[in-house]
């Protein structure tokens, strides 16, 4: 035991902080007023999304407004003998922490005879009629979360040493425990460095810079040795994979890895493996058009990374990154992304982030009174922004008329700087613009096709989500009023001759 304790010293130090909220459950030095032969335990599995520590007292804390976690399975093990053996060389806190860090070293976690209970719709799991004493000594129990529903992380193993008592010294016979259930989350937090509300779907424009955050908990035993091992660590894999299955986003940067108020990205740089969809090797590993992977323990110095993470064992970590909406995003197509956190090759925690979508608009420029397509009409796009008229500058367009898939849309008050949009000769929609935010705009015709005149230079419209494939706005031009034949024909000469003859007849 001495060797194992020495090996996990750094991890144990961090674990003691986590175990502190269990200290009230360790035996107090008060006089027992009445003998207790059996005890009941009620576990309250509730969602937690922060570093909040719920102080376990053994009493029902009456917590309300918390989301219960249904479907978690807990096993209970009697670790009395192991606990008292450790007490020969360690104090109670250290002994409890050692068992919590390496429970599989003291019990058979796959023991088919172990009692197992699944949390119900209220997040409760009850263990009834457990012996208060084992072999004449106060019993010590370990609670192990065997099955964890998605997208939650497994709670730390909890060690409870009986008796647990009321303030008056009498034994509690129904002990309430609150295992921490950390939720893996994925959120879009900013668009163009402006905070956005949490919701399931965000409207974006091409060129927008999106900031995402993936949050999860560093395992409380990240630095512990594997069960029954003197030199192999429990965790040899720690990966975060984030990806999109549809095109529309370009990875920009990993901006921060924050835990306990500290940004540890710089300390991890070049110690972990970091790959993005901008790297050539990405497509050989992941068949996704967008994403990144952080392999914390797969780099050149996994021990240094493990030691760093051990300092923050049990804390929530935030991985922040940015992506740019690109021209490949199809209007009205909802694009979501997924985060996966894995601590071993056989299991992963998966969470879906919010979806994003961009908009677009279709126009058909035609001859009035017919469906004849008119090419080479010229337009600019404008909008009103807080009573200021702005004009669209479409970046990255290929110069071909009719279809505009910009890499970015910026807005200027200088009309001369606006991008000139020309219609093609397409027989349906001959002017399309992609990557717009939903909203109100005005298309301004600045030049009609040759031989036609502008009826009304402005067309007000609203880009509405869900209408890209179904709505086309028609804009008509009328032919120029041609009273005289074109120069070079005989019509004008004949007209003048007839006029001269008629005039002569009048004067004769």
Please give the residue ranges for each predicted region.
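Solvent-exposed loop/turn and edge beta-strand elements of beta-rich ligand-binding domains
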Residues: 2-508
